[in-house]
Structures are given as C-alpha cells and as structure tokens.
Amino acid sequence: MVIGSFPVGKIFIHGVKRISKPFGDLLIWMGKHHPFIRRYIIIPPAQLYNTFEVRSKLRMLRLKQPRRIPPLSTPVATRLGADMLSEAFVFGIGAGLIYYELSKTYTKTKKQNQEIEDQKRVLDECVDCISADVERNQREINWIKAALKNVEK
C-alpha cells in the first residue's frame, strides 16, 4: 500500500476510520435488528464490492473469470457493508464541507469583483467629469484668447 509509507497518510486514514467507526457500529446494530435495512441497504454494496474485487483480482492475475462469484456470508457482508457505508458517510460530509467552503469562497470573490467593478464605474464617472471640466476650461481659455486677440487689434 503506497499511502502506508507516508505518516500523514496513515494519520489521515486512521482519523477517517476513527470517525466512521461509531456510525459503522450503528449500521451493524441496525443490520442485526432490522432485516429490511440489512437486506436492502447494507448487504448489497458489500456483495457488489466483493464481486468487483474478486473479478479485478482474477483479471490482474490473468485467470479465467468465473460465471458466478459466491456471495459473502451475512455477518461478513454486514460488517463490510456497514464499514463501506460509514466511510461513504464520512466522505459525504467531507465533500459537503469542501463544497461549502468553495461556494463561500466563490461568493466572497464574486462580492469583491462586484466591489471592484463599482469602484471602476465610480472612477470612470469621475474621469468623465474631469474630462468634461477640462474641455469646458479649454473652450473658456480659447474664448479668452480670442477675446484678447480682438482687444489687441
């Protein structure tokens, strides 16, 4: 396992397992006491994972693919399914937090860009006013020069 050589990776994986453990235990308890949840929510992902895992291992070993892969026993499938669902739950929370942070950053950036655009608009209006004043002053200067030329003649 490549991530096993990195201490930060080990800490991260250990943290995820520690966080997802109580939720997994709850799912296992629900699987034991509620057959509907066990049969339709917990066991199918575990059986699907088992099928993909066995087929991929056989494919990597270049062995013949069996027509039917034997299903996992109920306790093993319950444990595996509960672990998978608990880690998916933690992953979902993490993805939700990332989405929240990204949307918050996007909103903040959008607000800053809007403020910059407003400042640009105000500055453009000021420049237009100054340009109008300069043109008016230039016309007055030209009028005064013309008046001085007429007076000198």
UniProtKB/Swiss-Prot annotation:
Claim: Zinc is one of the keywords in the record: no
InterPro entries on file: OPA3-like
Gene Ontology cellular component annotations, sorted alphabetically: mitochondrion
Coiled-coil regions listed in the entry: 101-153
Keyword Glycosyltransferase belongs to the record: no
Alphabetically ordered keywords of this record: Coiled coil
GO biological process: regulation of lipid metabolic process
PANTHER family hit by this protein: OPTIC ATROPHY 3 PROTEIN, OPTIC ATROPHY 3 PROTEIN OPA3
Assigned protein family: Belongs to the OPA3 family.
Identification of the protein by name: Putative OPA3-like protein CG43998
Native species: Drosophila melanogaster (Fruit fly)
